Regions:
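Short carbohydrate-recognition loop motifs
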Residues: 70-90
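Carbohydrate-binding surfaces in secreted/extracellular proteins
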Residues: 106, 179-213
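Extracellular carbohydrate-recognition regions
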Residues: 32-69
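Hydrophobic single-pass membrane-insertion segments
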Residues: 21-33
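Secretory/extracellular carbohydrate-interaction modules
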Residues: 84-161
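N-terminal Sec-pathway targeting helices
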Residues: 2-15
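Flexible glycan-contacting loops in extracellular carbohydrate-active proteins
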Residues: 208-236
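Short, aromatic/His-centered strand-loop micro-motif at the edge of beta-sheets
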Residues: 159-186
Length: 246
């Protein structure tokens, strides 16, 4: 009996030692260029926001894993914005505010589908941004990936999903011909009266009553900042970001 107890105690000590070693190794390397986080994010080199007037925030889970805005990159290249993540990040301009009835849209081009990840990662636009840059930040985003699927999710400030746990397929969403091939999506979010509609490549893919999006645990309002949303480990060019009352 004593021998069995000693074996159990010894095994427990070994397990605890391994867990401590793994924790310390993770703590040492998380956040540096090329390092992983709990969600598999890999920090980019020469990161940060390189365009005046732009702001950003990485997801709370990424922050807890040691990631910062310097682990992702936003730069201007010609007429397009070039975003490389890194941690899952939201970007917005200081003066990008929309209220009432409006449409926010942008064109996203992934020049080499899945070149930074092992599975499709989405990108898109967000609206309803409030308390920006703080732990209470709220937003609703519609994002697509190059496998013909999309998600509608948000922060209130904790994450919430309007499309369930998994992404949804829709024939309107473009599919890349293969890994490393280009794919482009036109993505918009529109507020019209009591409805909020996500459209991709000119077709409505999701529509919600505003009352299901605003309230405790969700948006403060559909009014607020608008901007761009990227999952972790993406490499995307963005053009024609705009808000209109049409």
């Amino acid at each position: 009996m004593k021998r069995k107890s000693r074996i159990l105690i010894g095994t427990a000590i070994v397990v605890v030692a391994l867990l401590v070693a793994l924790f310390l190794a993770r703590k040492q390397f998380v956040g540096g260029p090329g390092s992983p986080t709990v969600e598999g994010s890999r920090a980019v080199t020469d990161g940060g926001i390189k365009i005046p007037g732009w702001n950003g925030r990485v997801d709370a889970a990424e922050e807890r894993a040691g990631m910062t805005l310097d682990a992702a990159r936003l730069v201007q290249e010609g007429q397009a914005l070039h975003v490389t993540t890194g941690p899952a990040t939201s970007y917005w301009k200081t003066d990008a505010i929309a209220s009432g009835d409006f449409t926010v849209k942008a064109t996203f081009t992934e020049p080499k589908y899945m070149n930074l990840n092992s599975h499709p990662h989405p990108y898109g636009v967000f609206i309803g941004g409030n308390d920006m840059g703080t732990p209470n930040q709220t937003e609703l985003y519609c994002a697509a990936s190059g496998n013909g699927k999309f998600i509608v999710r948000g922060f209130g400030p904790k994450p919430f999903s309007m499309t369930g746990l998994l992404s949804e397929s829709n024939a309107a969403i473009h599919k890349a011909a293969g890994r490393g091939q280009p794919v482009t999506q036109d993505i918009s979010l529109a507020v019209r009266g009591d409805k909020v509609v996500c459209s991709i490549n000119g077709s409505s893919v999701a529509s919600y009553d505003k009352t299901t999006l605003v309230g405790p645990g969700k948006l403060t309002s559909t009014n607020g900042y608008y901007g761009l949303r990227f999952a972790h480990n993406t490499d995307v060019f963005v053009s024609l970001l705009a808000s209109s009352t049409k």
